[in-house]
Curated annotation (Swiss-Prot):
Its main location: cytoplasm. Probably forms a complex composed of chaperones HSP90 and HSP70, co-chaperones STIP1/HOP, CDC37, PPP5C, PTGES3/p23, TSC1 and client protein TSC2. Probably forms a complex composed of chaperones HSP90 and HSP70, co-chaperones CDC37, PPP5C, TSC1 and client protein TSC2, CDK4, AKT, RAF1 and NR3C1; this complex does not contain co-chaperones STIP1/HOP and PTGES3/p23. Forms a complex with Hsp90/HSP90AB1 and CDK6. Interacts with HSP90AA1. Interacts with AR, CDK4, CDK6 and EIF2AK1. Interacts with RB1. Interacts with KSR1. Interacts with FLCN, FNIP1 and FNIP2. SMART domains: CDC37_C, CDC37_M, CDC37_N. Co-chaperone that binds to numerous kinases and promotes their interaction with the Hsp90 complex, resulting in stabilization and promotion of their activity. Inhibits HSP90AA1 ATPase activity. The keyword Acetylation applies. The gene is Cdc37. It comes from Mus musculus. GO terms for molecular function: Hsp90 protein binding; kinase binding; protein kinase binding; scaffold protein binding. Keywords: Acetylation, Chaperone, Cytoplasm, Phosphoprotein, Ubl conjugation. This is Hsp90 co-chaperone Cdc37.
């Protein structure tokens, strides 16, 4: 009979795992691998120190016993030295037993340590030849995944949302047992996107709840990839491990959860900023005048004396200011005002004589009120 209990001692992590695009995969697995390697190195260092200490203690015991035998054979009068060596030998044997007990505890600890991708197996062969099916084109696989996700969400969206609202471990396990088809990549992807949507809508408390369930599904998927089994066949093992209050495993879960929530907040912030930029650009395009210029930008580029004229909406004041300017500059600024819609030719200008050209200070131009955004820049 196969002993499946060893599966309870597997630390799920694999640097080759794939995660949803919204998750910073590189940082996630780099941190896990680094933390695991550091723990293994620290454990190995402690084990080597214990081994050295035990060997040194055994050496001292052997040396002390050798001296005792020499004194006993010599039958000299060194009774005091003999008693001292016997006391020392007794103390050293106590220390030896202490070192051996520590080594035994270390071996038990090593035996109970969770397996991981670095210790799960050893090379049986240095070279293997495996026939593999040719991979499908990346475009086809991506398109197929998108279609699969869309179909799955359309069918099970209500159930996925129900799972995302669960709080207790037992409730989550029972719901997945009753709806085992939800244990898949599509559920995890939907929950990630839902978290970002909730953060954009400023539903922070609800986002944190759904984020917790997202990490539950992510950890189950990682366990399945580590064991190379279907996620539906191993999700109960995740709940068994997490409910046994394994401190190290629980701390790892909490760390990944907090890191995920930070990434969700960052992604939501970027989405909001992008939407604001698109909105501002759309509003700017709405403001554009007949010549394609933004009245706000044109107003801000005008000399101060012309800006004052627009502020007080005084046509005569504007014409006086223009008449005092260099004709080239005046024509340049007035043309920009017309192109932006700050000024439009007077509708009565059609009464002017044919062929008569209106200049910057021509009274045939008058101010037409325009709706502004940040400033009322119309005269």
């Amino acid at each position: 009979m196969v002993d499946y209990s060893v599966w309870d001692h597997i630390e799920v992590s694999d640097d080759e795992d794939e995660t949803h695009p919204n998750i910073d995969t590189a940082s996630l697995f780099r941190w896990r691998h680094q933390a695991r390697v550091e723990r293994m190195e620290q454990f190995q260092k402690e084990k080597e120190e214990l081994d050295r200490g035990c060997r040194e203690c055994k050496r001292k015991v052997a040396e002390c016993q050798r001296k005792l035998k020499e004194l006993e054979v010599a039958e000299s009068d060194g009774q005091v030295e003999l008693e001292r060596l016997r006391a020392e030998a007794q103390q050293l044997r106590k220390e030896e037993r202490s070192w051996e007990q520590k080594l035994e505890d270390m071996r038990k600890k090593e035996k109970n340590m969770p397996w991981n991708v670095d210790t799960l197996s050893k090379d049986g062969f240095s070279k293997s030849m495996v026939n593999t099916k040719p991979e499908k084109a990346e475009e086809d696989s991506e398109e197929a995944r998108e279609q699969k996700h869309k179909t799955f969400v359309e069918k099970y969206e209500k159930q996925i949302k129900h799972f995302g609202m669960l709080h207790r471990w037992d409730d989550s396990q029972k719901y997945l047992s009753d709806n085992v088809h939800l244990v898949c990549e599509e559920t995890a992807n939907y929950l990630v996107i839902w978290c970002i949507d909730l953060e954009v809508e400023e539903k922070c408390a609800l986002m944190e709840q759904v984020a917790h369930q997202t990490m539950v599904m992510q950890f189950i998927l990682e366990l399945a990839k580590s064991l190379k089994v279907d996620p539906r066949a191993c999700f109960r093992q995740f709940f068994t491990k997490i409910k046994t209050a394994d401190h190290q495993y629980m701390e790892g879960f909490k760390y990944e959860l907090e890191a995920f929530k930070e990434r969700v907040r960052g992604r939501a912030k970027l989405r909001i900023e992008k939407a604001m930029k698109e909105y501002e650009e759309e509003e700017r395009k709405k403001r554009l005048g007949p010549g394609g210029l933004d009245p706000v930008e044109v107003y801000e580029s005008l000399p101060e004396e012309l800006q004052k004229c627009f502020d007080v909406k005084d046509v005569q004041m504007l014409q006086d200011a223009i008449s005092k300017m260099d004709p080239t500059d005046a024509k340049y600024h007035m043309q920009r005002c017309i192109d932006s819609g700050l000024w439009v030719p007077n509708s009565k200008s059609g009464e002017a004589k044919e062929g008569e050209e209106a200049g910057p200070g021509d009274p045939l131009l008058e101010a037409v009120p325009k709706a502004g955004n940040e400033k009322d820049v119309s005269a």
